[in-house]
């Protein structure tokens, strides 16, 4: 979020010239959310990219709904909370009720929470090994959690 006016002007010129297709902004820092939100309200953007995870839901309170209301695509980075979520559940079994939304791993549990948000377009998880790619793709298969199940997932992760 540095010199946003100049950067967005440049990006719009590039879009108009056909050099890029989409214009958006990104942040991974809660302390920038206020300025980020103001930019979202003031500017016409194609997308935003923000950090959002089952244990870090701040962007889901204001930024993600605002993007949905304004017709902006929403890309989620850090859906595993910089590894915090895996650390929190290390040695724990997946809840039995995770089968209700076709979930067979913790990575899928975390990603299905993210992509089931009605305003989220996609998640961008980091993957260090090929088997992680396969597992993460499993989150795109089968049922997604509904609103009540999403709340249950939040309560579960808040309790660990």
Question: What would you call each of these model-derived segments?
Answer:
Residues 42-47, 61-160:
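Structured C-terminal cap/extension of enzyme domains
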């Amino acid at each position: 979020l540095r010199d946003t006016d100049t950067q967005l002007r440049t990006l719009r010129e590039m879009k108009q010239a056909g050099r890029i297709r989409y214009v958006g902004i990104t942040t991974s820092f809660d302390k920038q959310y206020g300025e980020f939100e103001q930019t979202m309200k003031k500017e016409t953007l194609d997308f935003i990219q923000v950090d959002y995870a089952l244990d870090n839901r701040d962007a889901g309170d204001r930024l993600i709904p605002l993007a949905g209301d304004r017709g902006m695509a929403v890309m989620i980075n850090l859906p595993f909370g910089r590894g915090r979520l895996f650390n929190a559940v290390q040695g724990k079994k997946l809840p039995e009720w995770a089968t209700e939304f076709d979930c067979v791993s913790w990575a899928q549990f975390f990603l299905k929470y993210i992509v089931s948000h009605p305003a989220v377009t996609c998640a961008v998880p980091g993957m260090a090994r090929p088997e992680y790619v396969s597992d993460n793709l499993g989150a795109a298969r089968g049922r997604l959690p509904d609103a009540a199940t999403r709340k249950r997932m939040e309560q579960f992760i808040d309790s660990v």
